[in-house]
Each structure stands twice: as structure tokens, then as C-alpha cells.
């Protein structure tokens, strides 16, 4: 989350009123009343992000004995799930999904799954570019997506990460310093100055490229996208080749959102619960949205032939999903209210 830093000699109330999440004044967490953009000229904010993925990989290593660092990043079956669900041996038409990236970090959301449908990536480079597109603001929707679908440009040509702008302009013979300044201006959402646009035209930069730069509000760095893709590919390898370990670890890390009453009963019952939440649309609360993500994974798992066992007083763990006879045994924490 975002952490606002207040100088020792100041009080937060000099800058903004504060409030307690859910009006729980006895809690330790307070939030600023104003959006940070109202204060960003006065206070420093740190974005301290939590990542489950390193924990997931460590748990997968402990269960399978396979070191994620040794996973080949060119495994063909793993690469396939980013464009089809065929390596999983199932179809997911009921979820309006024809790729196998559900539950894969950075590639499992509805938004990115649609990107995968539109682009059908076949290489690590294309996955990296999709990661850059999905983490930017106004980079894909209303911008690169239209260019790709219209045939104006391909995925390999559109602007995906901030580095693409500088490298592209330099390769066309542009001035390195001006190319760098152009990249910095665009990635911060400041658009192009007349000088930058004139420089781009002097090296015959296509009009669609210039127009694309003007729409962008924020751009992801290429190295960051590469780190995300490598992590995602390693997790995906376990999903394809070691599904029992993958699903048990996925649920364990997200046990707080798991509800065994909604997840048991087989694929058709789970699908009915998925559709019930979807029907609520914007009326679905955060807990239901988190549960929907879990249920999609359970549905896919059931279609792959892996069942959820009932919670057992003598066999279930407190909070860890365990593998048992080719099936998965939920913990006590998966029971609502426990």
C-alpha cells in the first residue's frame, strides 16, 4: 500500500484530515482523507507493495523438490497456456476464457486474459510486451489495442514499455539526448513538446507512433516487466506439469478468501456459484470479488480431474491445503467463520 511520510516537526493534520478504514477507530491503521494527488507537492509517498509470488515459488519448491531457478524459460507447453487452454487438457468456454492463464500472477485477471486473446503471444518477448502494456495507463485500452486490432501495427511494433520510445527513436537515427527526454516526458504522462514532435518527424516517425505517445499517462519499465514475466512463467510451469502442487499452494496463500461451502460439490455447482456472483455485477462486494477469482480456479481444477475433499477433523490442517491421494484436502480456515 501507499505510505505517506510526514516530517517529524509536522503533524498529518496540517496537510489532510485522517480517517479509519470501515470507521473502526480502535484499529492501528489510518488513511488520508484526501487522494494523494492533492498532497503530492508537499509530502512524500512510498508505494510498499506486497508480493505473494516469492512465497508461492518457495512453497512449490518445498512440495515438489523442483527449484524454480532451474525451470526452462522456453518450455513449449508452458508457453502455450498464454494463448490456449489446450496444455491443461480442458476448455473453459463457460468462463468465457480460451487461454490457460487463470491463477498465473500478472496474467490471470479478466483484463489481461482479454489481452492474451487479442494478441496470442508465442514468445517471451511478447509476454514481456503484454506485461508492459497491462501495467501502463492508457497504453493498451484506447491506444495500442486499437492499433493491433486494426492492423495498423503489430504487438512487436506498438509502444509497450518506456524503453521502447527511446530505443525506437535512436534506432531511427534520432538524437540520443532528445530521445531520452521524449521517453521521460511520455512515461510521466506529460505528452510531447513541439520540439519533441518536430524531432520525431525529422526522423520519419510514423504518425500512429506520435499519436500513441500523446495518449499515454504512465509507462512501465522493461526490466520490471521482465522480472514479472519470469516469475509468472515459473509459476505457470508448475501449473502445467505439477497441477496438484500448484493448486494446493495457490489456495493456501489465498486461504483468507476461500470458502469451502462455495467451492465444494464439483464443477457444475462451482460454476453456478460463479454465475450467481457475476449476476450481481457492481453490487458484488470485495469479499465476493475475491471469492469469484478463487472459484474460477476451482472450476478449472475440477475440469482437470482434481477434486476437493471435505474438511476432516483428523486430517485437515489449520490453514494449509494438502495433497491426499491425488486430491486436495482443505484446512479448517476454509470454513466460513473459523
Segments predicted by a language model, with ranges:
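Noncatalytic, beta-rich nucleic-acid-contacting surfaces in large DNA/RNA-processing enzymes
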Residues: 1-338
Amino acid at each position: 500500500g501507499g505510505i505517506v511520510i510526514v516530517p517529524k516537526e509536522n503533524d498529518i493534520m496540517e496537510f489532510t484530515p485522517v480517517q479509519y478504514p470501515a470507521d473502526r477507530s480502535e484499529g492501528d491503521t489510518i488513511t488520508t482523507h484526501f487522494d494523494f494527488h492533492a498532497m503530492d507537492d508537499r509530502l512524500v509517498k512510498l508505494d510498499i507493495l506486497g508480493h505473494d509470488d516469492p512465497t508461492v515459488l518457495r512453497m512449490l519448491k518445498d512440495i515438489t523438490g523442483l527449484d524454480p531457478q532451474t525451470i526452462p524459460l522456453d518450455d513449449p507447453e508452458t508457453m502455450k497456456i498464454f494463448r490456449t487452454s489446450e496444455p491443461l487438457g480442458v476448455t473453459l468456454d463457460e468462463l468465457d476464457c480460451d487461454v490457460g492463464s487463470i491463477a498465473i500472477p500478472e496474467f490471470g485477471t479478466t483484463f489481461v486474459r482479454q489481452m492474451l486473446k487479442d494478441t496470442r503471444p508465442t514468445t517471451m518477448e511478447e509476454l514481456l510486451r503484454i506485461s508492459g502494456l497491462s501495467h501502463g495507463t492508457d497504453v493498451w485500452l484506447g491506444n495500442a489495442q486499437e492499433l493491433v486490432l486494426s492492423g495498423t501495427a503489430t504487438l512487436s511494433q506498438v509502444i509497450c514499455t518506456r524503453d521502447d520510445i527511446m530505443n525506437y527513436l535512436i534506432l531511427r537515427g534520432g538524437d540520443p539526448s532528445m530521445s531520452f527526454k521524449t521517453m521521460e516526458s511520455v512515461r510521466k504522462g506529460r505528452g510531447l513538446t513541439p520540439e519533441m514532435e518536430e524531432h520525431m518527424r525529422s526522423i520519419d516517425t510514423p504518425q500512429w507512433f506520435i499519436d500513441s505517445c500523446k495518449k499515454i499517462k504512465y509507462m512501465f519499465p522493461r526490466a520490471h516487466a521482465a522480472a514479472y514475466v519470469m516469475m509468472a512463467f515459473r509459476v505457470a510451469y508448475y501449473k502445467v506439469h505439477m497441477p496438484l502442487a500448484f493448486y494446493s499452494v495457490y489456495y493456501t496463500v489465498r486461504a483468507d478468501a476461500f470458502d469451502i461451502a462455495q467451492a465444494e460439490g464439483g464443477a457444475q455447482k462451482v460454476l453456478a456459484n460463479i454465475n450467481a456472483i457475476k449476476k450481481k455485477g457492481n453490487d458484488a462486494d470485495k469479499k465476493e470479488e475475491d471469492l469469484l477469482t478463487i472459484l474460477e480456479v476451482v472450476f478449472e481444477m475440477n475440469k482437470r480431474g482434481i477434486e476437493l475433499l471435505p474438511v476432516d477433523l483428523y486430517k485437515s490442517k489449520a490453514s494449509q491445503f494438502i495433497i491426499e491421494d491425488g486430491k486436495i484436502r482443505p484446512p479448517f480456515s476454509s470454513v466460513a467463520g473459523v
